[in-house]
């Protein structure tokens, strides 16, 4: 797939205008909809189907802050992420992440919905702060630091999913 920003004719930047993204998505889907190619050759039908799939994939990248940041870094550096290398470089954050997991375990054992809600709010606030820092670093073209924060966002995403699973368990009781 080609650059998702160029496919949607958007500037390569972290902040996205969601209304513009939706508008461009609908236009591209209309342009490459397989029904428009029903009377064309099999090759043209296949090409339209692939283009439609590329549009859908690009949309998912542009909508997800982690995937969008990763794409920006790869476009500007030509370097594909090495997840293991980043993890070794960010030991302080990994220690913090482990502490958050211990706190989540403690909250789960105490079965306190109120503590869990407060913890989720805290983690989402931390995540938003990292997203803001990431946007700044991307604008400043500090790719290596931005890549590190992108990895942090991956951890936040996983932690939030785990918190939501604990929340579901607590609601079942």
UniProtKB/Swiss-Prot annotation:
It comes from the Bacteria. InterPro entries: DnaJ_domain, HscB, HscB_C_sf, HscB_oligo_C, J_dom_sf. One of its GO terms (cellular component) is iron-sulfur cluster transfer complex. Residues 3-75 form the J domain. Keywords: Chaperone. GO terms for biological process: [2Fe-2S] cluster assembly; protein complex oligomerization; protein folding. PANTHER family: IRON-SULFUR CLUSTER CO-CHAPERONE PROTEIN HSCB. Belongs to the HscB family. Co-chaperone involved in the maturation of iron-sulfur cluster-containing proteins. Seems to help targeting proteins to be folded toward HscA. Interacts with HscA and stimulates its ATPase activity. This is Co-chaperone protein HscB homolog.
